[in-house]
Structures are given as structure tokens and as C-alpha cells.
């Protein structure tokens, strides 16, 4: 029976399904590896979870060979899939010999009947020397304007290079005839962009991609070539039309990362770091970072400016630490946190919302090789998603790690953390006792607090009745991985006119058409904005 509705609603109505990284469609661009012994990628896994108590049907399409895997997932039955045991036979990993001017058809596309979370996790070799993970940002990750960063191999003045260090940017098209333009403001003539001979500084690179095709830009700065390590920092990745204007009808997905890398300028530990990032419309000018368990040299924050004259303020400072132009970046060392222990916080802002920055966080465990990188969401009143759930926080395949979550929340909000597991054939959630966990009040941003909770296993729920930002992190020996599961949000229109049939309860925004789609068929509501 057809009905017409005019809905005036708050964001929370569809927050968990329409406006965050939980999504019905996920694009997974490939990563790359230089094949070195320490960083050689072994097992690669996809983890899928959902808040739905009913079965959700999904498909995983391997772009490389066209194979399709169909599966089901529900809240008490998260799903995991071994993609490959070796990087040489993987649809996730593009060999370093095929990056640059070569257009590839690697990576994965995941479609589901209802919104799902997707994370990719991997480790390098069976000895767990290195590990990496990234969370798909779903529809929030699609756009036409991105700025990049990765592991810096030191700070701006001191290099800590290894001969097998690699950094990369991976871009996947969602539509045919997509023009990807990459502008590299920090690349010099000797930058050695792999697979692109004769690179000319200041001249953008352009690539023509069809649906699901991808391009990877990579650098391998060897010891003594320190200027190359920043070649891909601040890169402007755009989807443009034939006239060179950004083309909103052809959004792309972007992943950035490093292999055998480090944030430290002094220690010898190395690890992998990778994350999928979001476009300009989903970043902001205020951020809160939560320290993990590394030393100051590894607990870094990298901010990339998109607008000239961007002023960076730390904590409650009234004088900017640095002023950046578009494509420039700052590396903030760990001594700027309000403490040296895990759970300490750092508030960073610019002078206003007209000066957004792309934010990356270096994270670490107690051992010097334990390193990773998160792409961090901005503070936003629209970030009100519960996390339900992070699948098997302590696992990468058969390997067991120690799980943690970092939480930013509003003072006075109710926070609930639960661990889920099946015991004796019955699945249940058990509350985590938060009474003994120290909360941290954020200096410079009254009204916000942080938690860090360690020793977690199983499937993790995090719930709040206000803003919520959640990252997970796991470590084992020399390896670590993690990423944000909550915080990336797109504000909805205030009023939407619905002309619908009763087809279900799964609503999602389509960034290509600008419509809200119900169950993927038979229904859409036009977004007047």
C-alpha cells in the first residue's frame, strides 16, 4: 500500500544506517607491498558485523577474478573470511611492480541487504612481525576531494629510513569514465614515484578509470633519500570531469598506507599502517586524540591543511603552533598529549570550520615495533552512532591479540561497553565494568571525556546517548592493528518527503544519485539538498 509522509526528523532516526561508515555498500581499494621479508603480507581477512538481529545477506565481489561469495551475518553471528594466505595470490594486494601508470582491477566490493560494518585485517608472515587493519568507511568514504598522509619515517627534520619502506595511495573508481587527478605538492623531481618515470613537480597526474578499476601511487625512499618520504604527503586526490572540475557523479574511494614503516625518528621498530580515508565534506576543524601505549616518538598526530592560512591550535593555546597552506602538514609529537600514559588526550583545532584539516594518528603498543595509524573523525554533533559490533576484536584469523578500545564521549552521557560471545551454543553480551577505569577530561574542550579500555576479547558493543567516537586497537608481540568504527557522519537534510512502499527498514544515502535508498530496490526518497 503506497503512503505519503512528510518527515521532520533528527539525525538519530537513521544514524545507524544512513549517515556513517556502517553501510550497505563498501569499496575496498587494494593495498601494496614491496615484498620484503619483514613486511611480506601473509593472511588477509575480511570481518563483517551488523546491528541487525535478523540475517543480512551480503556478497563479496573479488574484482580481480570476478568471483562472488554470498554470505549471511547477524548481530550474534559476525562473519570472517580468509581472502588469501599469501600476497602473491591475493585480490587485496597489488604487487609493487604494478603500481604507477598501470591500471589495476584488484580490491573488493561488498554489497548487503542492510547496513554492515566491514574491516580488513592482515599480518605480515606467520611470525606476526607486522600487522595492519583498516575499517571501510562505507558511503562516508566516497567523494571527490581527499588529502593524504602516512607514516613519516621520522619527524620533519630527522629521518629514520629503511631500504624496504614503502608508502602508497590507492584509489578505486565507482563509475565508468572516472578521471582521477593527483596533485603532489610535496614531491620533488627526485621523488621517485614508482612506475611514473619523468615525474614533473607541480604537474598533476591524471588517470582514466572504469568502474572498480584502481590506481596506486607509491614511493620507496631509501636511506639517504629522505626528501622522498614526504612525496605523497598532502596529495590532493580528486575525481574530475573533462573540464577539470570536481565531478560529484563519480566519487572514488581512497586508502593510504605504509609498509615496514615507523613514526619514530630514533627507534628501530617497524610495522604496517593503513586506513581508508574520507573526503573533504566529512572532515572538520576540531579533533580529540587519545593516546595509546607508545612513547612520544610514536604517538604522533599528522594534520594536513586544505586551505591556505590554516592555523593549528593545540589544547587551550590561543596562539597557533603553526600556520599551514593547502597541502602542507604538521607532525605533532606525543609530548603534546596531556599525559604520558595511555588514555591521555590531545585537543587540536583550527581557527574555524572554513579551515578543515585531514587528521591522522600514529598509535603504538608497549614494544617499539607496535605501531599503526588511524584516520580520525572530527568532532560533530551528528556523530551519534552506537557500535554494534566490532567483530572479534582480538583476532586476525587464528592469531590472538590483546584488544583495546579508545572512546571519546560527552561529559554526562551514559556509556555502555559489552563483550559478546557464544558459550554452550548461546550467544550473550556481558557488560564491561567501567567503574575502575580512569576517565580523562579533555583540556581545551570542556564537556568531553575519554576512556581507554584494554584486555578485551570477543565482539564489542559500545553505546552512548550522545556523541560517540570509537576506535579499536590490538597488539601481539611486534604487531598491531586497528581503526575507527564510529565518528564519521554526514548530517541529513532537515526535511525529507517520502513516497514509499513498505519494503523493509534499511535506509541508506546514495552519494552518486543524492537519494536515500530503501533496501536497494523499489523505493527512494529525494534529498532536497
Regions inferred by a protein language model and the residue ranges of each:
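Bacterial Sec-dependent N-terminal signal peptides
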Residues: 1-23
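Intrinsically disordered, low-complexity linker/terminal regions across diverse proteins
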Residues: 21-520, 527
Amino acid at each position: 500500500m503506497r503512503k505519503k509522509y512528510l518527515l521532520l526528523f533528527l539525525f538519530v532516526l537513521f544514524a545507524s544506517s544512513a549517515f556513517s561508515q556502517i553501510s550497505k555498500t563498501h569499496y575496498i581499494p587494494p593495498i601494496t607491498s614491496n615484498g620484503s621479508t619483514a613486511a611480506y603480507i601473509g593472511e588477509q581477512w575480511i570481518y563483517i558485523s551488523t546491528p541487525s538481529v535478523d540475517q543480512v545477506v551480503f556478497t563479496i565481489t573479488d574484482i580481480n577474478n570476478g568471483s562472488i561469495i554470498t554470505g549471511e551475518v547477524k548481530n550474534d553471528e559476525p562473519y570472517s573470511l580468509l581472502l588469501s594466505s599469501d600476497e602473491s595470490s591475493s585480490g587485496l594486494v597489488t604487487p609493487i611492480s604494478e603500481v604507477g601508470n598501470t591500471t589495476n582491477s584488484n580490491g573488493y566490493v561488498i554489497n548487503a541487504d542492510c547496513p554492515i560494518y566491514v574491516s580488513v585485517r592482515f599480518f605480515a608472515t606467520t611470525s606476526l612481525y607486522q600487522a595492519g587493519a583498516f575499517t571501510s568507511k562505507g558511503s562516508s568514504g566516497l567523494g571527490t576531494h581527499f588529502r593524504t598522509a602516512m607514516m613519516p619515517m621520522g619527524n620533519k627534520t630527522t629521518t629514520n629510513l629503511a631500504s624496504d619502506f614503502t608508502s602508497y595511495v590507492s584509489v578505486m573508481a565507482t563509475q565508468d569514465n572516472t578521471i582521477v587527478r593527483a596533485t603532489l605538492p610535496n614531491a620533488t623531481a627526485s621523488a621517485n614515484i614508482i612506475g611514473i618515470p619523468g615525474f614533473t613537480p607541480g604537474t598533476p597526474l591524471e588517470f582514466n578509470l572504469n568502474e572498480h578499476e584502481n590506481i596506486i601511487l607509491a614511493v620507496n625512499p631509501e636511506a639517504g633519500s629522505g626528501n622522498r618520504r614526504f612525496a605523497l604527503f598532502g596529495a590532493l586526490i580528486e575525481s574530475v570531469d573533462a573540464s577539470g572540475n570536481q565531478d560529484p557523479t563519480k566519487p572514488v574511494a581512497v586508502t593510504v598506507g605504509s609498509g615496514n614503516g615507523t613514526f619514530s625518528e630514533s627507534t628501530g621498530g617497524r610495522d604496517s599502517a593503513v586506513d581508508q580515508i574520507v573526503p573533504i565534506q566529512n572532515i572538520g576543524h576540531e579533533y580529540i586524540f587519545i593516546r595509546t601505549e607508545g612513547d612520544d616518538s610514536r604517538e604522533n598526530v599528522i594534520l594536513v591543511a586544505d586551505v591556505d592560512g590554516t592555523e593549528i591550535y593545540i589544547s587551550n593555546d590561543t596562539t597557533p603552533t603553526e600556520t599551514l597552506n593547502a597541502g602542507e602538514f604538521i607532525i605533532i609529537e606525543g609530548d603534546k598529549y596531556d599525559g604520558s600514559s595511555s588514555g591521555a588526550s590531545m585537543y587540536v583545532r583550527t581557527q574555524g570550520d572554513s579551515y578543515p584539516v585531514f587528521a591522522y594518528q600514529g598509535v603504538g603498543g608497549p614494544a617499539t615495533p607496535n605501531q599503526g595509524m588511524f584516520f580520525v573523525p572530527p568532532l560533530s554533533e551528528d556523530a551519534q552512532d552506537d557500535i554494534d559490533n566490532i567483530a572479534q576484536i582480538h583476532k586476525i584469523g587464528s592469531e590472538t591479540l590483546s584488544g583495546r578500545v579508545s572512546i571519546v564521549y560527552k561529559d554526562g552521557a551514559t556509556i555502555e561497553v559489552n563483550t559478546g560471545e557464544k558459550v554452550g551454543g548461546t550467544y550473550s553480551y556481558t557488560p564491561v565494568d567501567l567503574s575502575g577505569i580512569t576517565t580523562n577530561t579533555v583540556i581545551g574542550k570542556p564537556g568531553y571525556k575519554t576512556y581507554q579500555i584494554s584486555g578485551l576479547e570477543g565482539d564489542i558493543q559500545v553505546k552512548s546517548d550522545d556523541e560517540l567516537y570509537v576506535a579499536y586497537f590490538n597488539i601481539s608481540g611486534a604487531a598491531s592493528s586497528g581503526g575507527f568504527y564510529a565518528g564519521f557522519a554526514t548530517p541529513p537534510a532537515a526535511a525529507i518527503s517520502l513516497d514509499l512502499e513498505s519494503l523493509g527498514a534499511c535506509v541508506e544515502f546514495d552519494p552518486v544519485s543524492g537519494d536515500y535508498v530503501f533496501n536497494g530496490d523499489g523505493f527512494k526518497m529525494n534529498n532536497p539538498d
